[in-house]
Amino acid sequence: MAKVWSKRFDNALDPFIEKFNASIGFDRKLILEDLDCSIAHAKMLGKTQVLTSSESSQIINGLELIKVEYLEGKFSPGLPSEDIHYSIEEKLISLIGETGKKLHTGRSRNDQVGTDIRLWLRKEIDKIEILITDLQKSFFNIAKSNIYTLIPGYTHMQRAQPLSLAHHLLAYIEMLQRDRERFKEVRARVNISPLGAAALAGTKIKIDRQFTASELGFEKIYKNSIDAVSDRDFCIEFVSASALSMSHLSKISEEIILWVTDEFSFAKLTDKCATGSSLMPQKKNPDVPELIRGKTGRVYGHLQALLTMVKGVPLSYNKDFQEDKEPIFDTAETISSCMKAMTILINEGIEFNIKNLSDSVENDFSNATDLADYLVGKDVPFRTAYQVVGEIVKYCLKRKMLFKNLKIGEFKKFHPEFDEDVFSDLKPHNVVKSRNSEGGTGFVQVEKELNHWQKKLLL
């Protein structure tokens, strides 16, 4: 099949180079967006009388028919068409004849593909935002039932201070909220129309860029035709936002993987979200969080690929930009599938071992800060209190004891301000309850946080 640009050349493309150059194998994913873009363009050409009303209607009807045939499985774009744009144009010409050749008046593939990608990304971002919200709701539902369930908090993967499990889960909701906000910000910059910028310099054809932008739901148009076709920063922003969101999913995954080990035993996997071993019959493997953790690197790789793609590319459009599509397509699919999988895992795949969680905070030194705070409440300088408690920890470790095993006389050997009420302060429930600074893990603060998210998530 002859290329639309073939009259300029004396010889045909080398067959391998033809396949190497083609993008139809992956940009056919943009078929519906390309059809919508072309329909809006054809309407505009009719409105501005570049085409007659009859020609505009004929083209629009032809494009609508192609859409129907595609949705019914009767039209499948592919080689020898070079890309989705030519594939549709060739199909249109075969349906309506010479009038179909007028569709491309006043535009270039450069602004056309930029428009298609933005339309596609806009839809994907909207889907991802919904998926993030669904995951937030899943965490919320578990959190509201576990305000008084305690869990060890860690720094440097060492026991630090006890926490409300609800507070721990609400931390994930906060992270996911920032992810949602980033996607909203990306969407705002995606939602700008390049259509009408043509190849790079605009066009002498009488067009109405504001009309096509409005038809396609864009907020505004690019003000500079060169810029409109010269950058893929919006693609990079999308993958960057996705990479950050995946980093949060990976963090959550890592914690779940640890929690379900025999060593931690803070939770267990249900049969719905675990697999077995081909050799070891006792195994129950956390494949879902492991896969999410692994797929995070995949999105990081796409981000690096796009950053490298645009590095040092001069104005304006360059063929390098053909390499933008597979990274964003795969990124969208990856983050969407991981969000769905994590939501199912949280809803159906994990059960917390409340007894083990409770036992774990009863048998460690994570209340050491509270012992120091007790002395601070007795007007002892914090640094002095800190050093005193350090000595007590060392004393207990040598004797394989915990604070709760000491007698008041032993406490007083380290500082005279210790009294019987110290034992109440050291109980894990009271330790957590006392952390009532704004945003803290104290039960009153956690309830406030839950009320905030109940309204925010419209629950």
Curated annotation (Swiss-Prot):
Listed pathway(s): Amino-acid biosynthesis; L-arginine biosynthesis; L-arginine from L-ornithine and carbamoyl phosphate: step 3/3
GO molecular function: argininosuccinate lyase activity
Catalytic activity from the UniProt record: 2-(N(omega)-L-arginino)succinate = fumarate + L-arginine
Gene Ontology cellular-component annotations: cytosol
Gene Ontology terms: biological process: arginine biosynthetic process via ornithine; L-arginine biosynthetic process
Regions annotated as coiled coil: none
Disulphide connectivity of cysteines: none
Pfam families per record: ASL_C2 (PF14698), Lyase_1 (PF00206)
EC number assigned by the record: 4.3.2.1
Keyword terms of this UniProt record: Amino-acid biosynthesis, Arginine biosynthesis, Cytoplasm, Lyase
Localization terms from the record: Cytoplasm
InterPro entries: Arg_succ_lyase_C, Argininosuccinate_lyase, Fumarase/histidase_N, Fumarate_lyase_CS, Fumarate_lyase_fam, Fumarate_lyase_N, L-Aspartase-like
Cited SUPFAM superfamilies: L-aspartase-like
Enzyme class, UniProt record, top EC level: lyase
Family: Belongs to the lyase 1 family. Argininosuccinate lyase subfamily.
Protein name per UniProt: Argininosuccinate lyase
Encoding gene, per UniProt annotation: argH
